[in-house]
Amino acid sequence: EHYFKVEEADRQVLGDPAGEIISRGGEVLFAVSRGREQVIGTCALIRLENETAELAKMAVSEEAKGKQVGLLLGESVIELARARGFRTLVLESNRKLTPAISLYKKLGFIEKPIPHPSEYSRVNIYMELSL
């Protein structure tokens, strides 16, 4: 809730990741700090269609920001999407998340017109990566 209010779609996915992500062919990734065994970042790969997946729910703890954790998670989810045979990886975000948008561009995502109304009121940017 630091940047946006938690919406019903957030509650649904975060409240049942096994049912909403994993059972549908997706996966949740975690970054764990060395030594402390503490989760410092996470993101999800959500299967949308046979050849399309979404990078979603990326978050990095305050103490881990600026330490390339987001980059490592992004690279890992891209590698996983390729290994699973997806041809396109998409994401929805908000332009005020400037560091995140810069990261997505660094990972190769390209801004595209928003193709359909989002489940989230905060979405004002849509990006795609051809795998």
Give residue ranges: language-model regions.
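Active-site acidic-Proline motif in GNAT/NAT acetyltransferases
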Residues: 61-63, 67, 95
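C-terminal "cap" of GNAT-fold acetyltransferases
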Residues: 87-131
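Conserved acyl-CoA
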Residues: 72-89, 103
